[in-house]
Amino acid sequence: MSSRCLSLLLCATACFGAGGRVLRVCADPNNMPFSNRAQQGFENQLANLIAKDLGMTVQYYWFPQRSSFFRKTLNAGHCDIVMGLPSGMDDAATSVPYYRSSYVFVSRRDRRLNIKSMDDPRLHHLRIGVHTIGDGDGSLPPVNALISRGIVHNLVGFNIYGRLDEKNPPADLIRAVENNKVDIAIAWGPMAGYFAKHSSVPLQVTPVDVVSPDPKIPFTFAISMGVRRGDSQLLQRLNSEIQQHRPRIHRLLESYGVPLLAAPPSAAAIAIPERSQLLRNCCKRGTDL
C-alpha cells in the first residue's frame, strides 16, 4: 500500500469511524433537482436522511460533475459517498438501487402530441431538442437512437454542461419546449420531471417506450449510491438504509417529479453495456443518470 493510499485510508477512518460523526458527500453545487449548494436537491435530502439515521452530520465537497468528477472527488479521498450513480458503474462500489428511471419525451400539453415511441413517424419532421456533450465523450442514448433511425437534420442540441455561472444548465432544454423553440424534447426523466412540474406552461412528460434494435442503447437506468471500492462497511450500511427507507425514498422522489419505474425482474436486467459513461453524461455525472 502506497503512502498516498494509506493517508486516504486514515482520513476515511477518522471521518467515518468511531471517532468521527461526519458523512462526507461529494456533489455538484448547481445540478437541480439532484443537488445544489443550498442543499435543495433530492440527493441532498437523502444524504440528510441517512446521516441523521446514522447519528452523523453531512459535510459536502462541492465539485462540478464533469467527466473527471469521480477521479477528483470520491477516488481522491475528498468524500466517502456520492448519492446518485448507475448501479454497477466502474468508478465506485455501488449500493443496491434506490430508484429506477428512464428518458422521457417532454412536450407542451396544448400541442397534444402524445408521442411515446422513438419509432413515431412524426419525429422525422418535428424539431427535437436533445442534450449534447463535448467531443470525445460519445453521445447520449436519445441522440444515438435518433441517428440510427435517420433522424438528424431536425435535431436541436443543448449542451448539458452549460456555463459554470449559469443556473441549472440542463433546464435550458425544458425551457426551449416551454418557449416553442422546439416541438418536443427527449431528456433524462428525473431532471425533466422536476422542471416540468415547476413549469409555468403545462407540459406532458412521457417515458420513452423503446424497442431498440441495438441493445447497447439503454433508456432506463437503476440508480445507486457509490463509495470507494473496498469500503464494505459503509456500503453495507447504505444497503441497510435503502432497504429500510425505500417507501420514504420513493415518496421523496415523487415529490420532486421523478418518473419511477418498477424494479427489473433480476439483477441481470440492469447490467447494461456502457451505461456508466452514458449515465455519467446524461445526469452530469456523470446521469450520470
What does each model-identified segment do?
Residues M1-L6:
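Bacterial N-terminal signal peptides that target proteins for export
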Residues G41-D53, R109-L113, D119-D137, P213-L260:
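Extended ligand-binding regions for polar small-molecule ligands
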Residues D28-N31, R100-V104, R111-N114, G157-I160, ...:
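Periplasmic-binding protein-like
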Residues M56, S87-D90, P97-G150:
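A conserved helix-loop-strand patch within extracytoplasmic ligand-binding domains
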Residues I50, T73-N75, P121, A176-E178, ...:
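Hydrophobic residues within well-ordered alpha-helices
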Residues C11-G17:
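Hydrophobic h-region of N-terminal signal peptides that target proteins for export
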Residues S68-F69, N75, M83-A93, E178-I217:
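A ligand-binding cleft/hinge motif common to bilobed small-molecule-binding domains
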Residues G19-D91, R163-K167, Y256:
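Extracytoplasmic small-molecule ligand-binding "clamshell" domains
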